[in-house]
Amino acid sequence: MNRSGNSQTTQKLVNLDDIWSELVEGIMQVFEHEKSLTRSQYMRFYTHVYDYCTSVSAAPSGRSSGKTGGAQLVGKKLYDRLEQFLKSYLSELLTKFKAISGEEVLLSRYTKQWKSYQFSSTVLDGICNYLNRNWVKRECEEGQKGIYKIYRLALVAWKGHLFQVLNEPVTKAVLKSIEEERQGKLINRSLVRDVIECYVELSFNEEDTDAEQQKLSVYKQNFENKFIADTSAFYEKESDAFLSTNTVTEYLKHVENRLEEETQRVRGFNSKNGLSYLHETTADVLKSTCEEVLIEKHLKIFHTEFQNLLNADRNDDLKRMYSLVALSSKNLTDLKSILENHILHQGTEAIAKCCTTDAANDPKTYVQTILDVHKKYNALVLTAFNNDNGFVAALDKACGKFINSNVVTIANSASKSPELLAKYCDLLLKKSSKNPEDKELEDNLNQVMVVFKYIEDKDVFQKYYSKMLAKRLVNHTSASDDAEAMMISKLKQTCGYEYTVKLQRMFQDIGVSKDLNSYFKQYLAEKNLTMEIDFGIEVLSSGSWPFQLSNNFLLPSELERSVRQFNEFYAARHSGRKLNWLYQMCKGELIMNVNRNNSSTYTLQASTFQMSVLLQFNDQLSFTVQQLQDNTQTQQENLIQVLQILLKAKVLTSSDNENSLTPESTVELFLDYKNKKRRININQPLKTELKVEQETVHKHIEEDRKLLIQAAIVRIMKMRKRLNHTNLISEVLNQLSTRFKPKVPVIKKCIDILIEKEYLERMEGHKDTYSYLA
């Protein structure tokens, strides 16, 4: 029986010399690969290391001697002998390389030895695992420099004793192989890749004992920097030579191929796909170098060719050039400028050509010409330039310029484009035999909005559109109420509620008028009143409709009674309201039976002015112009135009030429009137009305602009309180840019008006600064 109490375990002391001869023999076997270690051999060597590291030394070695209490960690002598072994082994290995000649042989031998050495170092690291986990770890934690885990120690030895001597010829051989591959020769990519992997594996900081930290210093300094320099030199020489014997478009294809080849060299390095051999961190610098040499140095040539490609509509080549130049967005500036100028020129020329067919009076041709240019280059920007924002902006700028300034606007007025666009809308939305289907009409209206976006004077468009919409509504000539509402909705989305509020009120007035007609008929029935004619009205709110009051005019007695009855009805229904009749907008139908040889009757669709003249001939067959003027109280200028229309229609006849009528000229009812049609429309606008209408539009535009400018100034100053002249002008221009471009002198005049009205004042001592007066 053992006596109970404390027992002391005695540990065997292992002398390094006793185990080293067997251990070094095994290590040499690992590095020479004469035959593989058996499992039992591996475990025996591992045990030697373990026993040595765990033995208690009576005379502690190394830095362990400073510690007291408990067993000391042993390992420095073993570590030193391992380090010395590696140095000796590598020195002997280096002598074998001196006899090698030829780059490929050198690469083959170097990569073979590296892989073997790397594998052997891994095995040695496993054998010395206990040393790594204890003595090495403790030394590293205490900040001891130059101490590494055994695998890392092996790499440090390779780096210091073999790599430093061989890296230059090896790197030179690798670079030569890459150049040969660029020249179209087949190379052994795996050799290049293995060398690169060696450089990457050796890229650690020797001052950093953590093997996981990888700075790629060896790779960068000994390979990448030289590789990038060679790449730049190679492609600089090649690009100059290629461009001297090939077209620019062929060069673009060549550059595409070259960039893809370089991408393949670096793509998927970690995946070992067999095609790549450069480390992934080289991707960016390689890309930028190739782009600089292959693209940026030849931008001037590209710019010239870009214009040629635009002229020739070579969209595929344009796309290729864009995709290459766009690799660096800063290089696109000149291309965008060239595109803008090209579209501007093409648009201006297209409008100039269509003007030979009087496009100034043909809104459809004018607008379609603009749309054709926009469609062509919008498709180009979308497909060739990837809808790049900068190229979209170039398209927009160019379209804005040629739409607002071209031969049509210069020959007529700056407001001609919005006027013609409004007239084109009128063609689309007015009833005709050529009205498109709903889907096509919607597409056409969408195209209108494309052009509308570029119109600078949107207030001019609004005036003309409003006037034409008003006529469509009162004349009931709209092709579709839905289409009208759709167009107003599109304008509202683009310009806001205020822009379309009057247009929407017009629709409301037409709806209210339908109800009023029904109420008027009920009123007549309740009063037992009869109507001698079929009578209908539209009651329009004066602030929303772009019509002017009629000139003096004596309503025919046949119409006067109906007008009087409606006035009485409306006054009873809406006390205090006053109706002003727009006779120039009224129309009706007359039944005419004048032919002495047959009883055929004709229905004439006529204006109220025309009706007032024709109804005179129920009493007698001929009148002088003066007599008709006295009877109708129509202005002579207007009356003569009415008579000219009736004479051209052969309803009346005169011995005088229709273009030289005087107050004494006599006109007669043409009793032999014949026409194949039974319904004849003779309702034509008077030239004087059109002239007044045109002058009124421009007058109202200028007046409205002044009011808008003043309102903008007040809004800005109310918010800012104080503002200098330059900033106020700038903010006014910015606020109103979506409606029109105010002229600076007009803004200045509006500021003066507001000062007079005491909305603003100039600050004392700062005459260029204004303050808002609440």
UniProtKB/Swiss-Prot annotation:
Keywords: Cytoplasm, Isopeptide bond, Ubl conjugation, Ubl conjugation pathway. Component of SCF E3 ubiquitin-protein ligase complexes consisting of Skpa, Cul1, Roc1a and an F-box protein. In larval neuroblast self renewal and asymmetric division, as well as ddaC dendrite and mushroom body axon pruning, the complex contains the F-box protein slmb (SCF-slmb). In caspase activation during sperm differentiation, the complex contains the F-box protein ntc. Interacts directly with Roc1a. Interacts with Fsn. Interacts with Dlish. Interacts with Cad99C (via the cytoplasmic domain). Interacts with Sans. There is a cross-link at residue 718 (Glycyl lysine isopeptide (Lys-Gly) (interchain with G-Cter in NEDD8)). Disruption phenotype: Severe dendrite pruning defects in ddaC neurons at 16 hours after puparium formation (APF) and axon pruning defects in mushroom body gamma neurons at 24 hours APF. RNAi-mediated knockdown results in a significant increase in Akt1 protein levels and activity in ddaC somas. In the larval brain there is a large increase in the number of neuroblasts, 40% of which show a spindle misorientation at metaphase. RNAi-mediated knockdown results in apical detachment of scolopidial cells in Johnston's organ. It is found in: Cytoplasm. It comes from Drosophila melanogaster (Fruit fly). This is Cullin homolog 1. Neddylated. Deneddylated via its interaction with the COP9 signalosome (CSN) complex. The gene is Cul1. InterPro entries: Cullin (IPR045093), Cullin_CS (IPR016157), Cullin_homology (IPR016158), Cullin_homology_sf (IPR036317), Cullin_N (IPR001373), Cullin_neddylation_domain (IPR019559), Cullin_repeat-like_dom_sf (IPR016159), WH-like_DNA-bd_sf (IPR036388).
